[in-house]
Amino acid sequence: MMDTEKDDLPSATDHSEHESCDIPKTGGTTSKTASNSKDPSRPRRKKARRACFACQRAHLTCGDERPCQRCIKRGLQDACHDGVRKKAKYLHDAPDGALVPGAQGNFYNQANGLSKMSPSDFTPNGTNNIQQPKTSSIYASSTPSYNSNSTFDASSATNPSLPDSAALNPGPFTATPASPTFSISASSAMPALTQPANEMTTGAGQNSFGAFFDPSDPALFNFDLASMNFGNRYGALEFGMLGHMATGAGDTPPSDSGNQRGGSIGQRSNSQQFGNPTGAFTTESPNQQSFMFGDPVLNDWSGAQNTNPRMSVGGTLYGQGGGMHLLQQDAPHAYAIGSNTFASPSSTTSPHATTIAPSNFDDSPMKTKTVISTPHLRQQSLYNANVNKRRHREPSQIYDSVKEPYSYTGGFHKLIAFIKRRFSPPKTVRIAKALASIRPSFIATTKTLNQDDLIFMEKCFQRTLWEYEDFINACGTPTIVCRRTGEVAAVGKEFSILTGWKKEVLLGKEPNLNVNTGGGTNPSSQTDSAASSIRGGAGRMRNPEPITTNTAPVFLAELLDDDSVIEFYEDFARLAFGDSRGSVMNTCKLLKYKTKEDMDLVKSDDGRWNSHIVGKGGIVGEAGMNRLGFRDGRVECSYCWTVKRDVFDIPMLIVMNFLPHI
């Protein structure tokens, strides 16, 4: 009798009464070997995910079952429930039920029940009542229970059914207390493909003065909580919301969006949110518009670049032909980053179709352009553009397309011929000495390479350039990438804005008609006769006609003035086969792209370009960046460049970043 009472008492060396129960007994006595807590052969108990309230207060090991064994042994099985853990500071406003592990499996299992509904559950008149399933009793105290009936009234529907595309989105189609009733009016002119999905859409008619999102409807933001590895539903919601805010942010709203937002409260009930590849809502009625998340502000930014002709850099707007008409103060901001550039506050677009007339640009050859701003058409064109871009950005095409090595010998011959035409003999000698110092290294590294090695070298170049193009598009700094011969291989749009050189001209896709060589302080004198002393003395101004009109990549020496070219090649001779991770920081003067027509335009300017910049105290937008150095044809910059080598330790490409002096 004494042994039994002694066994019921917890031992000082045991951590819980469960552990004492697991110790084997022989003849009423406890084995000393099994009672040793440090014995490796002693059976270990699996830790519970969450202890009950009684075990938590007693600091004892609990189990996953409810009621647990200790509470059953003590007669507390009726009061055995999960203990409450201390919340983190950022979770103080979260309900207790949302923090229970595995809550996503119980909160959002209604979708499975809805997908099993038979067609008979829908009434013939186009209406159906969907009752939200009851949740588990564990959330009864934290989640308010409600029974909402969502009425879908489709006037053009005859026999609606659950679309097959609904399986693509596991989100629930249940109603929420914030929006109990929805009335969707479908147009007969809409395609039949989108009609079934529109009839099943819910949650779009929320009041604009309510919460920004409904926490009980995660499908509103197109992410599945069950697929996220989070221990609680609240953390998954927070993570998904942050991701939505990061990817769906928009720029300054258009000026007329205030009226749209006020009048769009009744238009939010006809939006399709499921099965949409772009995340934007489509339009179901010709008299109503659909907006991304019920707000026209977030819907306008995605197509701002396509609908705004001022965002074009390579066109005639930022070419020198229409340079005098860039004084508009509503020009877009400079250095806009990304493929879908946000619209500036002044470059607004109306929700209706607008026409850009060429009257604002008197001498510009821009034609009248109709801007289509219908939401579903704009979103479809954006989706097609993204698909085509992803198809084009396939690195495997590089290895299939490169069949021949690049002729660097011909490139160096063209470079030497250009240097002899443009520079005076003393400057030509300095550049030739710099190139001659690295010529033996080039010969030594390439003499053992065969045809396959040269083809592989070109594939490495194209593959590296493929990666650098992504960095150039993501970086707002004027950037160019050149081969070791100095031929331009890639260029960012910011560089085109700054210098006026179109991307097509730099890459050799269009003829080079530049006449600006930076020879004098007044570039208008450079349009004189091309026979004026091309091979003259060092002190004479050298102003040739356009060097070539054929389509060939532009050399880096054509983009810099004389002194900057000499300094670059002297630095390149030291860095080409020197420090593999070294870089050079220096100042230079970039030459603006100017044709003969631009030179005539500068003559009649009378200094208004530079005086306008000084008077304003800076630059405004892309037009202001384009005005830098317009009169003298040179832009003072600070630039940093480095040399990237290939697998044969040969200089492969030159990456250069420029920042103008304002």
Curated annotation (Swiss-Prot):
Listed GO biological process terms: cellular response to starvation; gluconeogenesis
Example of a GO MF term: RNA polymerase II transcription regulatory region sequence-specific DNA binding
PROSITE patterns (alphabetical): ZN2_CY6_FUNGAL_2
GO cellular component: nucleus
Keyword Cell membrane: no
Superkingdom: Eukaryota
DNA-binding region location: 52-80
Biased composition (Polar residues): 27-38, 112-162, 266-287, 522-532
Role according to the record: Transcription factor which regulates nonfermentable carbon utilization. Activator of gluconeogenetic genes.
Family: Belongs to the ERT1/acuK family.
Protein name: Transcription activator of gluconeogenesis TSTA_069700
Native organism: Talaromyces stipitatus (strain ATCC 10500 / CBS 375.48 / QM 6759 / NRRL 1006)
